[in-house]
Amino acid sequence: MPKKFQGENSKSAAARARRAEAKAAADAKKQKELEDAYWKDEDKHVMRKEQRKEEKEKRRLEQLERKKETQRLLEEEDSRLKGGKAPRVAPAKVTRAQIEDSLRREQRAEPVEKAKSHLELPLEENLNRRLQEEGSVEARTVEDAIAVLSVAEEADRHPERRMRAAFTAFEEVQLPRLKQENPNMRLSQLKQLLKKEWLRSPDNPMNQRALPFNAPK
């Protein structure tokens, strides 16, 4: 007679069940790790994408701001140029007091030089020398000669100092005016313009040398 089937061993079944459960747990853990890694990579990709988008927008806004600033500066410059030159200001007269004040400053800054007066030289020598220098003055009498010498002595005792002092006073008054009238000129151009005006100015001692000794002051 064949043996009767007695069924599966309970211990073997329990062991198989435990192995199956452990394998299922390991598989579930591995699957979870794979899913976590996937979503982690996806999050990084999304973050990088968002970061690049933000940086691109930031650069666009910066470029737009620079364009606006450049346009504003161009409009200001165009408006200033279209406005034309500043209103012309009437030339200010250099006064005798200003010239004398500049002369005094020059004299204080330089050593005092002793010069012979007309009293230390013969009248004829003074007269001839002054007539040669001035050319346009004629003295027919002793009184005229004294007048010529007095005027010449006052005007030309220190001609180089007087010229520098007069030009300094002229520049102090006229250069600010030229800057206001010609805001687009460089300083070198303004000084060239100032020299041209100085050559024609009645404040230039060289323009006063040819005046007759008895001309009204």
Curated annotation (Swiss-Prot):
GO BP, one annotated term: cell division
Family label: Belongs to the CCDC124 family.
Coiled coil as UniProt keyword: yes
Modified residues (Phosphoserine): S136, S188
Matches recorded under Pfam families: Ccdc124 (PF06244)
Compositional bias per record (Basic and acidic residues), positions renumbered to this chain: 18-74, 98-120
Coiled coil: 15-82
This protein's GO CC annotations: centrosome; cytosol; midbody; plasma membrane
Keyword annotations from UniProtKB, A to Z: Cell cycle, Cell division, Coiled coil, Cytoplasm, Cytoskeleton, Phosphoprotein
Database matches in InterPro entries: Ccdc124/Oxs1 (IPR010422), Ccdc124/Oxs1_C (IPR054414)
Cited function: Ribosome-binding protein involved in ribosome hibernation: associates with translationally inactive ribosomes and stabilizes the nonrotated conformation of the 80S ribosome, thereby promoting ribosome preservation and storage. Also required for proper progression of late cytokinetic stages.
Subunit field text: Associates with translationally inactive ribosomes in the nonrotated state. Interacts with RASGEF1B.
Subcellular location field: Cytoplasm, Cytoskeleton, Microtubule organizing center, Centrosome; Midbody
Region (Disordered) residue spans: 1-120
Domain of life: Eukaryota
Protein name: Coiled-coil domain-containing protein 124
